Amino acid sequence: MEAMDRFTYDERGATDRPFPESLDGGWPNGYTVMVETHAIEAADPSAAFIALTEGILAWNLHRGAGLTMESDAGRAEPGVRVVSGFGLGRVRIKAPCRVLWSRSPQLDGAGRAEPGQRAGFGYGTLPGHPVRGEEGFYAELTADNRVVFICTAYSMPASLLYRLASPVTRLTQRYVLSRYVLSARALAAAGPGPR
């Protein structure tokens, strides 16, 4: 494996938490941890869950949040390398990652999502990313048929420069998270595309 494709942290896989595994606790020590959950109102929870999951897996959650996504794959699958970019105009910070895990929605025989599941993906940072760590993006269809968008992360600055800029980095992360939530709501509201 080339140096540019090696993960920048050792504690991999903590974002891979299938339903009903708790998102509280169990995170690696020494990292700043974020766990955000946002209810998504949906007249048809199954359709909204499927649409949100497919949007997450096809990078559309990120694009809808205003990030550029460069990947040789149209879908998040383990091993896929992706570079997200955020910023204004030509001033963009590139953030290379590799997908660690992904989970598609589980459907019944009628093509409806079965309640009590979590789907999405998690990726880890590669050299050149401003932080070291991992982030997970999930759609959850609870056992009582509610749709929830979840974003988790554990990270630390990748260099002294980013450590000094950590207050700005945290503000940027909060802003991007708010954009993810808006994007998740739009994806869920759009319903699933053709299968």
What are these regions (language model features)?
Residues 1-89:
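Hydrophobic ligand-binding cavity/cleft-lining segments
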Residues 36-38, 139, 151-153:
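A structural signal for short, well-ordered beta-strand segments
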Residues 50-61, 101, 128, 144, ...:
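Short, intrinsically disordered, mixed-charge
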Residues 83, 122, 147-150:
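General beta-strand recognition
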Residues 89-143:
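Hydrophobic-ligand binding "helix-grip"
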